């Protein structure tokens, strides 16, 4: 599909500076990214917000997905998850996959698409992406119209800018109430980070939404 190929040039320059898929020797500074219209799941009033910067073709990003589900099982209804697109130039199908997922998000079907894409990381051709979108339940006509628009590319470019501002150096990178975690880490690392973040948030004297807004206002660094 030509629509995916023409989109690649739009964002390529924005993705080439990132250096790794997996782990990095340096953690980024504390940062609570603005959520805006990014896909979210979990309670809006959760004490803990986890922002994920990820690439749909990155094997480490796919590897950590079952662990994230385990976090929800271990700490039910305690985390609001937020996704930010970060397709790396080393992965030629990551950007088309992000565009496909963002167009599913327009129909409130981002998370079914997210699950499908990570379950089929070796099947991200144009035709496969359309099959995944159909499996996720999207209206295909509206989805195709979205693919031909600038909106998903603009969203991805904005997510990329947020990643640069946050000094993200690898995918996946997570910010747990602003505290960074990088890579496909063990379950215990995520649970410990969530527990510590929740305790600190509850001691703040603020409501959950107010607390995250306060973190955002501090900026990155």
Regions from the PLM with identified roles:
Residues 22-24:
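Bacterial signal peptide processing site
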Residues 31-48, 73:
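A short beta-strand-turn-helix
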Residues 27-37, 208-211:
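N-terminal low-complexity, Pro/Thr/Ser-rich intrinsically disordered segments
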Residues 46-134, 138-139, 197, 204-221:
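Structural alpha/beta surface segment adjacent to cysteine/selenocysteine redox centers
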Residues 1-10:
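Bacterial N-terminal signal peptides that target proteins for export
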Residues 2-3, 131-221:
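C-terminal cap of thioredoxin/glutaredoxin-like
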Residues 17-20:
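C-terminal motif of bacterial Sec signal peptides marking the signal peptidase cleavage site
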